[in-house]
Design a protein with these regions (language model features):
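Conserved helicase motor core of SF1/SF2 NTP-dependent helicases
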Residues: 1-213
Length: 213
């Protein structure tokens, strides 16, 4: 960043927004505090804490809590209600493809614009169920807004959002930060295509949350 900024980070003018805890997916073993301290070593700056989640609906926030264990004070979560998060379980890539097509058809029947739908996966496109889709136009995500449904890896979509997110190729929930990023990209509708083993893992996570309430 410093190389792109006139006078660099130390002397230039900049504003940085960041989630240095749950979305620091490339900083394994380094805490959010340590990341900010690294910036402190370069320059001085004013800190301002954002305290309200303006993106996700209450059901999505609840699923984030269930899957990742991340529990923010409830007054910081959004007050906006929305549809429940939908989980669809698959046993083979073929069955996952059928379920993905069913979701896309359901959204089309509900008159959801294709451009408001993004499919996210922990896998690259060639290894994802998206590569098996036929009869649907799914473009690779680009910054320029388009009219088509888009695909992107969860990692590359960090910091972005869309009205409807479909998480595909989910075979487990142990990568908590990655799952946090994926789940929290959705503004309104969230669908999760999970494997049989991921379903069992999710059931255990749900029990953990219920016992802790």
């Amino acid at each position: 960043i410093g190389g792109c900024l006139k006078k660099g980070l130390s002397r230039g003018r900049w504003t940085l927004f960041g989630d240095f805890s749950m979305q620091a997916i490339y900083a394994e073993g380094v805490s959010g505090t340590k990341l900010i301290e690294k910036l402190d070593d370069i320059t001085s700056f004013i800190r301002f804490k954002l305290t309200v989640n303006c993106r996700n609906t209450k059901p999505i926030c609840k699923e984030i809590e269930t899957v990742t264990g991340f529990k923010a004070p409830h007054d910081l979560w959004t007050k906006v209600d929305g549809p429940p998060v939908q989980y669809l379980t698959w046993s083979t890539m073929e069955s996952q493809c059928k379920k993905l097509k069913a979701v896309l058809k359901q959204l089309a029947d509900s008159h959801i614009e294709p451009g408001k739908i993004t499919i996210l996966s922990p896998r690259k496109r060639e290894d994802s169920v998206v590569s098996m889709l036929d009869g649907y136009v799914v473009k690779d995500f680009s910054v320029s807004p388009g009219m088509n449904t888009t695909f992107c890896t969860i990692q590359a979509y960090k910091g972005l959002e869309n009205s409807v997110i479909i998480l595909a190729d989910i075979e487990g929930f142990s990568a908590e930060k990655l799952m946090y990023v994926g789940l929290s990209r959705a503004c309104t509708g969230l669908y999760v295509l999970e494997s049989d083993s991921a379903k069992r893992e999710y059931d255990n996570l749900l029990m953990r949350r219920l016992f802790n309430e």
